[in-house]
UniProtKB/Swiss-Prot annotation:
Belongs to the UPF0235 family. GO terms for cellular component: cytoplasm. This is UPF0235 protein Cvib_0403. Signal peptide: none annotated. Gene3D superfamilies: YggU-like (3.30.1200.10). It comes from the Bacteria. PANTHER family: UPF0235 PROTEIN C15ORF40 (PTHR13420:SF7). The lineage of its organism: Bacteria, Pseudomonadati, Chlorobiota, Chlorobiia, Chlorobiales.
């Protein structure tokens, strides 16, 4: 059963993220409205929370930070994240391995 809705655009996986900045730890909290809810230690100042969001998913997928992009919602808690060079199928399989 797929909880995270992953789309694909030009060979890159896209999915929705709801962010809670200034949390006690950086982690994936679980599913949220077809996407994921994450907590970030970083404050939403000077793009720090967006950079930490990218680092979190880069670590999960074993890819370079520069291959993870916040493509919409840079100044919002609701964001769209793109994994460059990762297909939607690969992303879905990874989320399933993580129990998401």
């Amino acid at each position: 059963m797929r909880v995270v809705a992953v789309r694909e655009k030009k060979g890159n996986a896209l999915f929705s993220v709801r962010v809670q900045p200034r949390a006690s730890k950086t982690a994936v909290s679980g599913p949220y409205a077809g996407g994921l809810k994450i907590t970030l230690k970083a404050a939403p100042v000077d793009d720090a929370a967006n950079r930490e969001c990218c680092r979190l998913f880069a670590g999960m997928f074993g890819i370079a930070d520069g291959r993870v992009h916040v493509v919409s919602g840079r100044s919002s808690r609701s964001k769209s994240v793109m994994l460059e060079g990762v297909s939607s199928r690969e992303a879905e399989e990874a989320f399933e391995r993580f129990g998401l």
